[in-house]
Every structure is written in C-alpha cells, then in structure tokens.
Amino acid sequence: MIMLILRTTNMDIYFVRHGQTMGNLAKRHQAEHTPLSSLGREQASNAAKEVAQLNPTHLISSNLVRAIETARPIAETTNLDITIEQNFAELFRPKYLHGKHHLSPQSIFYYALWFFGIENRKLAGESYEHIRQRITVAKNILQRYPKNATIVVVSHSVFINLFLAHLCRARALSVFSLLGFVSKIVRIPNGSITHVAYDSDAKEACKWSVVRKTTETNF
C-alpha cells in the first residue's frame, strides 16, 4: 500500500499505534511490559517503511514496552533517536485488571469509576479527568517543536482516540459520545498511522486538525 503524503506548512504529527501483542489478540488488559507478538514485530517493520516516506524530523514513543519495540525499527529506518515520553502512554489501568477481558465485570466497574472521575493510581487506575490533563500536557510538548516539524508519535489506541476527541475540546464527552468513542477504539488497527496537523499561525481558536484518519500499513 502506498501512503498518501500530504505536504503542508503546518507541523505534521503522525500517530502510529504500536504493533500487535498477545493481549490485543485476546482482548485483555495489559501490563506495561507486554512485548510485541511475531505479527506485531512485522507490523512495526511495515510501519517503519511507511514512516520513512514521510521524512520525519522527530520520533517520540510512549514509555511502554510495546510502543518502544514498535519505535525501534522506525528509528533504524529514519536514523532518528527515540524520545521516550510517558505522557503519550496508554490509559493507566489498575493492576487487578491485568489479564482480564475488556468486557469482564471488573472492567465494567473500572470504566464507571474512570468516567465519573474516581481515581486511585494504585487501586482504580487513571480517571477520565486525569488523562484529559495528560493530553493537554502532550499537546504542549508537541507545540514546542519547530513549526514545520514532522513528528512521529508511537502510542496506543485509547490514547490516540482520546487525543483526537479532545483536539479542540477540553471538557468531557457525554456518555452517549463515549459509546461512539468505544467503537472507534476497535477500528484503529495495530501498526496504523493517523495524521494530525498543528498550525501555530491559524486564526481559528483551535489550531489543531485531523488531516487523515487511520491508514493501515501493509501486513
């Protein structure tokens, strides 16, 4: 598959979802140290070939193992150093969820705590309010790069989707909007690329935009 490259005068940010893990395949919550599967390593290699066509200037990765393992072939292909940044990591889940199915009773209970802002990093994981604050920090990090930079960010499905949902929105999504959001999470394949732009000179109140949604790489 040949990826469409759109040249702009904006800052271009390409979010790459990490390669597949066995936890992804089983639809189970994962620990921070989960590695890529053999297919995931192939997806990372293919993503690296696609990313090389973009001539990126900077490479950022979440601090989770599956993201770093995806970023390594990109770094090798582009000759860029990896900047590890925990603010682009996946939604922090409580340890009692590790290995549990996404639709288990424990998961449903956590989702309710998450939405209503109940947060305990040791017991209940990260709340919706906290990850929105983290997205704001992540956006500020990106905005500090040169205005014509081309940045690749290796991240995760929930984080990428929430980043897109809150590009121009600080307040929480409604319950009904979140239901639609959940379906979008499923549709971001491992190794796929999403193109976002930031125009510091834009006259609009929001200087962010989605240029191209999920683009699958060749598997």
Residue positions per predicted region:
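Short beta-strand scaffold positions
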Residues: S61-S62, Q133, V154-S155
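Internal catalytic-core helix/loop-beta-alpha segment
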Residues: N120-K147
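Acidic, low-complexity terminal tails and accessory targeting/binding regions
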Residues: I2-N10, I84, E90-H102, A165-F219
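An N-terminal RHG(E/S)-centered segment typical of histidine phosphatases
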Residues: M1-P56, R72, T77, K203-F219
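Glycine-rich phosphate-binding loop signature in dinucleotide/nucleotide-binding domains
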Residues: Q53-N55, R144-A149
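Phosphate-coordination/substrate-recognition cap region in phosphate-metabolizing enzymes
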Residues: A48-E119
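Generic beta-sheet signal
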Residues: I13, A149-S157
